[in-house]
């Protein structure tokens, strides 16, 4: 990073602050020493103008609709790569050679099984428990079963924990689904690829032969790639903040899952699907467009707009193509939800109201339709998001551990409570 400087003036005080520039992207004013030198700190609710760290993993240009992983466009990775190749890239910084990929795939496969006692752990949950509640508990409990990989100061243990998390998340997610619907658990089959293995664990039953459809497996793999990492979002920041205290990796990922469960974060694809269902038919779209424009109407178009993107989410285009491939393979030619989605997207992209407000389709707009077609209930949508995002969380966590500038996270607040006052005994109040 090359350094320039900026002046901050308030009252009679003026300080020079270093300005840093990354490889690409906007310049950043470094205020790390501001409080130490001036007893003043900044106010930024939601951290919308704050960089909490340096990172070489993911770059987003929201104005241009660009998403890069280690410099590679998401479009190229989703079109030509597979999920484990992207995992290797996020973890190690480069795409693997053929030999490296073979070795990495083998090491992940080696860890797909979970401790047999985990199956009994599941029975402590109600059958109607939300799968995300189950995932929070089970992932957090992994440190009790795999305590030989919780020393964060040991690079080897961190590597083992990383592989275990990537390998075991599909198994745990499938177990959560099977437990939820009352079917027996299906063990992983390690001669299958990552996505095929997951689909088999979800949808196979002991009494029937299950053959994974390669088109559906490829779609599942692409969905995993599209959700693998997305810079310093709420759940990733949660993982980093938890990790800054020295917490073990399983606890940090469980914290990320809990944050992702929030409807404003991981639940957006479910909300988008519910919205399409509510609209019902194409001829009702104008009614809902009008409602979306009405400030006094609580209705909001879900799957449009993004906290970062002020252009078309690059993942949305890939997700739209994937949705068509899945529906075509399954022979679903007249899906009313897809018809509504296509027409709604067309109107939104040509309507001045949405263009001016930069409300473009995001990745959640088509992912709900695709996951529904694959056979997943809406309660599993966020679980699949967590499964895919685990590698991003792990890569970000590892980067934080290795960063010499990182310390325990400690945001400040602007105190607006009562000033100093004296305690009054209860008998005199």
UniProtKB/Swiss-Prot annotation:
GO terms of molecular function: citrate (Si)-synthase activity
Organism, scientific name: Rhizobium tropici
GO CC field: cytoplasm
Pathway: Carbohydrate metabolism; tricarboxylic acid cycle; isocitrate from oxaloacetate: step 1/2
PANTHER family: CITRATE SYNTHASE
Similarity-based family: Belongs to the citrate synthase family.
GO terms (BP aspect): tricarboxylic acid cycle
Membrane-spanning residues: none
Protein's name in the database: Citrate synthase, chromosomal
List of catalytic residues: 306, 364
EC number(s) reported in the record: 2.3.3.16
Catalytic activity entry: oxaloacetate + acetyl-CoA + H2O = citrate + CoA + H(+)
This protein's record includes keyword Transcription regulation: no
Gene name, Swiss-Prot/TrEMBL: ccsA
InterPro entries given in the database record: Citrate_synth-like_lrg_a-sub, Citrate_synth-like_sm_a-sub, Citrate_synthase, Citrate_synthase_AS, Citrate_synthase_bac-typ, Citrate_synthase_sf, Citrate_synthase_typ-I
Classification via NCBIfam families: cit_synth_I, PRK05614.1
Keywords: Transferase, Tricarboxylic acid cycle
């Amino acid at each position: 990073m090359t350094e320039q400087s900026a002046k901050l003036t308030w009252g009679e005080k003026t300080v020079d602050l270093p300005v840093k520039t990354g490889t690409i992207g906007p310049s950043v004013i470094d205020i790390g020493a501001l409080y130490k030198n001036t007893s003043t700190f900044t106010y930024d609710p939601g951290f919308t103008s704050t960089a909490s760290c340096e990172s070489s993993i993911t770059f987003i240009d929201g104005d241009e609709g660009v998403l890069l992983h280690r410099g590679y466009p998401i479009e190229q990775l989703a079109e030509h790569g597979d999920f484990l190749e992207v995992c290797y890239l996020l973890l190690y910084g480069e795409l693997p050679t053929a030999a490296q990929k073979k070795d990495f795939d083998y090491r992940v496969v080696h860890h797909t099984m979970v401790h047999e006692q985990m199956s009994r752990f599941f029975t402590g949950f109600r059958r109607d428990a939300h799968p995300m509640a189950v995932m929070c508990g089970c992932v957090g409990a992994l440190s009790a079963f795999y305590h030989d990989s919780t020393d964060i100061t040991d690079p080897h243990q961190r590597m083992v924990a990383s592989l275990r998390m990537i390998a075991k998340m599909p198994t745990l997610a499938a177990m959560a689904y099977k437990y939820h619907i009352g079917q027996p658990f299906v063990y992983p089959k390690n001669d299958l690829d990552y996505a095929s293995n997951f689909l088999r664990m979800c949808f196979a039953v002991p009494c029937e032969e299950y053959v994974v459809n390669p088109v559906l497996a490829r779609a599942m793999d692409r969905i995993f790639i599209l959700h693998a990492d997305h810079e310093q979002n709420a759940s990733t920041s949660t993982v980093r903040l938890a990790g800054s205290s020295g917490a073990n990796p399983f606890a940090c990922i469980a914290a990320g899952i809990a944050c992702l469960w929030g409807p404003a974060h991981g639940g957006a694809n479910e909300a988008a699907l519910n919205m399409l269902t509510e609209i019902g038919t194409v001829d009702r779209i104008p009614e809902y467009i009008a409602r979306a424009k009405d400030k006094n109407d609580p209705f909001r178009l879900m799957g449009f707009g993004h906290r970062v993107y002020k252009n078309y989410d690059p993942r949305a285009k890939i997700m739209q193509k994937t949705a068509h491939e899945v529906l075509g393979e399954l022979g679903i030619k007249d899906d009313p939800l897809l018809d509504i989605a296509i027409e709604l997207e067309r109107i939104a992209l040509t309507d001045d109201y949405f263009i001016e407000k930069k409300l473009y389709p995001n990745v959640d707009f088509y992912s709900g339709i695709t996951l529904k077609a694959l056979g997943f209930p809406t309660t599993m949508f966020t679980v699949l998001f967590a499964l895919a995002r685990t590698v991003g969380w792990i890569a970000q966590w590892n980067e934080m551990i290795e960063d010499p500038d990182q310390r325990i996270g400690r945001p400040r607040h602007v105190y607006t409570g009562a000033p100093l006052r004296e305690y009054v005994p209860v008998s005199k109040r």
